[in-house]
Amino acid sequence: MPQILKEEIKNRIYKAAAKIFYEKGFLKTKMKDISEEAKIPVGLVYTYYKNKEELFDEIINPIYYYLNLAIEKEEKEEGSALERFKATGEEYVLKLLNQHKSLVILMDKAQGTKHENAKQVFIKILENHIRRQVQKKGIIVEEEILIHILASNFTESLLEIARHYENPDWAKKILNLVTKCYYEGVNSI
């Protein structure tokens, strides 16, 4: 089979799986559903992916990549939290939001996979990021729960943008409003 055809079939499987996982979640999705959406025999799906979990992982892996890259790049920057975010973090968060369906699949549709606690993992990653930045600035946080609340609120904000995603410009506009509130307070809008 020519390489172009193989890639085209794999791409059809990927798109079909993303659509079905987004609609039904991991638990209710069958490989037969994916093959029907891709308009190929179910056996051909198994030629490209050994099981549903492998296909699911391929769809959601970019989310972890962009989250970790955003944090890594932002932590190398100098300046205020907002300046650091604008300098580098925003670019990667927008890339993450461009994968909005994958983000929703990971956070809302992963029950039955090794990723079913992804939202809590995401929050923990952000908590550690906030904690490192607070320590770097020598700030003492009176109540540790504040760091959790900030991380949780930011995570939920990103998820709401992903769940209601309209287009890249809209996502950037809403992300700018959210980060302005997040870093400067509600009175800043």
PLM-predicted stretches and their roles:
Residues 91-113, 160:
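Amphipathic alpha-helical segments used for helix-helix packing
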